[in-house]
A protein has these predicted regions:
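Conserved GNAT acetyl-CoA-binding A-motif
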Residues: 129, 134-149
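Conserved catalytic-core motifs of GNAT/GCN5-like acyltransferases
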Residues: 24-27, 147, 157, 162-176
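Short acidic/polar active-site loop segments enriched in Thr and Asp
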Residues: 106, 142, 162
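Conserved acetyl-CoA pyrophosphate-binding loop and the N-cap/start of the following alpha-helix
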Residues: 119, 123-128
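Short amphipathic alpha-helix that is part of the acyltransferase structural core
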Residues: 4, 11-12, 16-69
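A conserved beta-strand-loop-helix scaffold within acyl/acetyltransferase catalytic domains
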Residues: 66-115
C-alpha cells in the first residue's frame, strides 16, 4: 500500500509504478501519501527488514535493545511482519513496524507497533494498523488482540479497538 504524506490528510497514491512498487516492496504493498510532508509511504509485508535498521527504529521509540538474533527468531515465528517505509527510489527508509503472532487461522496478536517519533501524529500509525488488519482478515483471522502501553491506549480506542475491563480475561507471566 502506498500513501503520500500531505498534512493530516492521508490519501491513497499511485505515484509509484506497479512494477517499481512490486520490485522494491513486493506484492500486496500499499502506497499512500500524507499531505503536510509531501512524502510517499509504503506499507508492505513482503519487503525484507534490515535487522540493524529495525533495531535503530525501535531505539528511536525508546524501547530497550534486544539481541538481534532473538529479534530474527521472533520475526521468523511471526505470522505477519509489516514494515512502513518512507519511499525513496534507491534507499527506502524504515519508519514504522509491527508484527503479529498467532495460530494463523482464527486468532492473532499484534506486537511491537512502532512509528519513528519524527513521523508520529501524521496518521501513519493508523494506516499501518489498517494494513495489518486487512492482511489478517485476508488470511481468515477474525479475532485480533494487542497489548498497548497506557500512553497509547487512546490511539487504539480512536481506531475502534475495544478495551477489555482490567483483569477480566487477561493473565500475564514474566520471567525474572
Amino acid at each position: 500500500m502506498i500513501f503520500r504524506n500531505q498534512g493530516s490528510l492521508i490519501k491513497k497514491s499511485n505515484s509509484i509504478s506497479s512494477d517499481e512498487l512490486i520490485n522494491l516492496y513486493g506484492l500486496n504493498s500499499y502506497e499512500f501519501t500524507q499531505t503536510s510532508k509531501e512524502e510517499i509511504f509504503v506499507c508492505s509485508k513482503n519487503k525484507d527488514l534490515d535487522l540493524i535498521e529495525l533495531d535503530q527504529l525501535l531505539q528511536t521509540v525508546g524501547w530497550s535493545r534486544r539481541p538481534i538474533r532473538r529479534v530474527k527468531r521472533a520475526l521468523d515465528f511471526s505470522i505477519l511482519v509489516v514494515g512502513l517505509w518512507r519511499h525513496d527510489d534507491k534507499f527506502p527508509r524504515l519508519v514504522g513496524f509491527a508484527r503479529c503472532t498467532g495460530d494463523g487461522i482464527l486468532e492473532a496478536t499484534v506486537w511491537d507497533v512502532a512509528v519513528n517519533p519524527v513521523y508520529q501524529g501524521l496518521g501513519l500509525g493508523k494506516e499501518l494498523m489498517k494494513y495489518i488488519l486487512k492482511e489478517l482478515k485476508n488470511i481468515g483471522i477474525s479475532k485480533v488482540t494487542l497489548f498497548a502501553d497506557a500512553e497509547v491506549v487512546s490511539f487504539y480506542k480512536r481506531q475502534g479497538w475495544i478495551l477489555e475491563p482490567r483483569g477480566s480475561k487477561c493473565a500475564f507471566w514474566y520471567a525474572n
